[in-house]
Amino acid sequence: LQRVTGEPEPLMRTVIYDEASDYMAAGLLHPPELPSLIWNFSAARHDHFPAPDLRRYHAPASQPLGYYFNVQFTNTGSHLADGEGPWKMEQNHRMLLDCGPDVRLSIVNSGNTREFPLTLSAHARMMWDFTRYDSERFLAEFCARHFGEKHGPQVAALYRDYFNAYWQQRKSDIPGFPRQYLFHDLRVARAARDLMRATVNPVPEAELLGDRGIGYYRIVPEDSGAATKVEAVRLGNQQAAARFAEVAHRCDTLSPQLDAQDRGFFDQSLRLQARLMAAASE
């Protein structure tokens, strides 16, 4: 890099992800603290919040930092329906800023761009003016811009209720961090697959819907008033389905009132996602 760029200290980054994150948290990995090396931390796997390595690190003022956040996660996360939302995305980055002041880089992962316009737009706005960004203000402005001053507040309320409809399969363990654990659409699909397979190839109930050593499901039955993980999945998703169905019904009522162009965007970015999650969770 020095030869190609001609710079004595070309800017580089190292992505601290997966096992590297575990090694950092355990104190086994020590990247050099250089003003030309961005320490690019990553949200935790399967559920997207700052991992222990970031929460335990306090960077020198001269150490540049970055962050990798999964809006979509093609394993157990959001895939066809936005699950994380602007508030959670913002809180992840605010916790990065608590670690050190020199934030240089932010990466959001989203393969299906069409399904995540709200959260991706929120991220773009946040990075444009990180200091002044606020998710509530962004949501109000986003909805007013796309759906007009008359209907914008109604759509904003629907977005809030949609994101809060997700089943939270265990209680948050980071103080002041709501919606830390979510049962995303792919978790619903994986759980249905595992339960159907178990009817053909029975396995002990204690092994069903486990974490597989990587936090695959992260179900705590008692947090949902259940005795087993299977019962928790049934109860949690039934309740989530009712919440999503209520949001979908309100979307059905509002959609015909919107202008044609606004209606198409509304239907694809919110109404259909609420209906999908209602049907999948039922």
Residue spans of the language-model regions?
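Substrate-binding groove of N-acetylhexosamine-processing glycoside hydrolases
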Residues: L1-E282
